[in-house]
Amino acid sequence: MKSHLQYLELFRAHRDLIDAAAPAFMGAPREEAARLLEAQGLPDSRTERYKYTDAEAAFAPDYGLNLRRLAPQADPYAAYKCNVPNLSTSLFFVVNDVPCPAPDSSRVLLPEGVVVEAFSRAVHTHGEILQRYYNRAAQTDRDFRTGHDGVTLLNTLLAQDGLLVYLPAGAQLKAPIQVVNVSAAKADFMSVRRILVVAEAGAKGAVLLCDHTEGSQRYLTTQVVEVFAGDGAEVEVYSMEETHRQNTRFSTL
C-alpha cells in the first residue's frame, strides 16, 4: 500500500473525530486536500524538492497520532528547557502537536495586542484572522512538475490545532517569540503541526522555532508555517533543531 493511502483511510474512518476536536475553519479545506493527495500521493526522490528525501518511505511506518487531542501529562514550562545564550525571549511550548497554555511570565515582554495562542483558543477572540489567513499560503505550495506538495496536503488533511502568532499594526517586539516544539511520547509518534504568523502593517518582530526530542522513540513531524506581512511589516523567522537520529521532520515555510 502506498503510504498516503493509509492516511486517507484513517481520515475517512475518523473524519468525525478529527473535525470534532478541531476548530471548524480547519475542516473546510480537508476534502480538497484529500482529493489532491489521493490523485498524486506523496513525493519521492524523483521530485526535485525532495531529491534527497523520500517522503513516501518516511511516512510508510505505522505511527501513532493524537486525534483525541489529549493534553501532555507534564507541564512543559517546568519539565523542559531551551535556553539560547545571551538572548531573552517570550517562551511558548508545543508538545508533539498540542500548543500548551503559557504562564503569564511568557507574555511579560509582549506589546499590547500581540497574540501567541493555540488556534482552538484564539478562534474565540481572533476568529476572523484565522478564517482569513489559514491555508491561504499552504494551498498554493506546489511542485510545478507534479502538482501540489503532497506532504503539505497531508498536513492540511490531518491538522487539528495550531499556533497563531499575531502582531497588530505598528507592534514592535521587544524580544523574539520563541516556540519550542517538543516530541515526547511512549511509542513511535507522528505530529501534525501548524503555525500561522500574521504581522499587520508596520509591525516588526522575530519568531524562533526550536525543535527537540525526548526519549528514543521514532518521531515523524509534518510542520507547515504560513507567514503574512502587511505593508512595511518586518518578520524574521529562524529555525533550530536539536533532536536524535530517530527523528524525521518535514517543515514547509
Q: How would you describe each model-predicted region?
A:
Residues K2-H148, T152-L153:
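N-terminal amphipathic, basic helical "cap/leader" segment at the start of enzyme domains
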Residues A122-H126, Q131-L253:
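Conserved beta-strand/loop scaffold segments within soluble protein domains that form the structured core
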